[in-house]
Amino acid sequence: MKNLFRKLFFSLTIILFNSIVADAGSYPDYTREKNIHNQITSYIFDSDIVELSSKLEHKFNLLATDSSSDTSILLLHGRGLHPSEPNIIDPLRVDLINVGYNVFSLQLPVLEKGKSYNDYFKIFKFSDTRIESALNYINSKKNIIIAHSCGAHMLLSFIDNIGIGNISGIILLGAGAVDKDQVMKTDINLSSYKIPVLNIYAQYDHNSVKQFADVLIVQYSSTQDKYLNTLEVNDADHNYKDQTYILIESVKKWLKAL
């Protein structure tokens, strides 16, 4: 009887421990975010760093440049990065500021390095409410979201769980990227929202990104010319190395035509 009790107690202890570990893994890495904050505050001079809060969190950053335009652009970075990451988000941010748009770039929740799409999926509830808070703060007549990679996953989660809200248009960059042997868990038909979408992917992008591009084309098959534009950037990889200029010019051309 004592041995049975010990085995039962040991089993319950393991279950409780695994539950605690799993729960701990479903929160952003705030230490890493604090380090990011300390780094970017030393070199960001063209934007205000605004501290926002959400239903789930007390403090996270939004880079904000208000140019008194009717159009605001919210940038969502890729996995584990920050609102001024140098490959895609910051070049876009600076160039769009120079054009005269109101430009905002949100710190999305991050995990420790090496985490996969499936790990990040567990914290999408935090990105949902961060995006909601950012859009409430911006509150422009026309709100466009540009989202890269995991930022695109988080945007789709936001739309699926909270709604399209006051979003006027979407630009997806490298959307649909997942790790090997993983699949997208957010099942959403963007065509039902009837807003303009520009989906950009690279010639040498991940297979999952190209598969998602095909899914979008099928979703928009009846209204494709009206709402969906698709662009493949030649000689580019997922981070558009050496092709950032073409990416930015394509984005600006689409925005101007809205």
Model-derived features: where do they sit?
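The feature captures the conserved acid-bearing segment of alpha/beta-hydrolase catalytic domains
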Residues: 174-232, 237
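A conserved short beta-strand
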Residues: 165-177
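Serine-hydrolase catalytic machinery in alpha/beta-hydrolase-like enzymes
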Residues: 56-61, 66-137
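C-terminal catalytic histidine-bearing segment of alpha/beta-hydrolase fold enzymes
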Residues: 225-258
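Gly/Ala-rich beta-loop-alpha elbow adjacent to hydrolase catalytic centers
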Residues: 146-156
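Active-site signature of alpha/beta-hydrolase-fold catalytic machinery across serine-
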Residues: 157-161
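Classical Sec-dependent N-terminal signal peptides that target proteins to the secretory pathway
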Residues: 2-24
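N-terminal cap/lid segment of alpha/beta-hydrolase-fold proteins
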Residues: 25-66
